[in-house]
């Protein structure tokens, strides 16, 4: 990775910032696309801003992409997206513009590259008759967010067939770790536990899997180095499911919280997926990927980080039925 020219869209976001910091540490020459220049105040990248090139561009606007059309990159990681599943029902146009049009624009008007890695989502699977979710499963997206992600994936595949350029689609499953938004389930549970705020959840019998962010970044980097690049979509996930009620209890315990746990206080959302976790055979066999940080160790690291910065987060009111 040393001295490679890398472009990261969404590089100031949660996963993107972890990827950017890792790339810088490996000696890559990293450019980061941000929507607004003011994002340089973002603490996620404060330690590496002097080592990255910042490009201000709104990927939904073709004109803003022309400024770096003549550049060339070894790898483009496309992570910029509208990322909240529940809110995508309230902001359909924004979700689709950010996840479909922005992706199409970047693929059509991007600078030259040797490899393009598109970040899709496990949400594209939607309702499935069996678990774990395999790459061979037919996607059945059930939210505007998931529809947008799958549409972006289809466009990327089309572009790959059209140009014969290596475009890889990766479907990471739920990811957590330091610097994550308080609107995600694990940070919300941690912050409420640390503040001893009552925690209300659904019955919590639905299952998810959660992957510590460093493990996901490992998978991204393996995809960037693999020769020849895989032609098929790849799941990145641990294949370990946990019930949401057990997740809440686990975090409550690890935080030593005095919060009141109100399991079952909230209804499930109408489009609830009852079981959702990765089939990771391809990641294990093709990439030789394995999670290096266990789920519990990842939780402990995350709790330690949020404990340091808990005072900087808002008091949360969003219900834990919006996974």
Task: Give residue spans per PLM region.
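C-terminal "lid/loop" region of Rossmann-like NAD(P)-dependent oxidoreductases
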Residues: 203, 231-234, 243-248, 256-275, ...
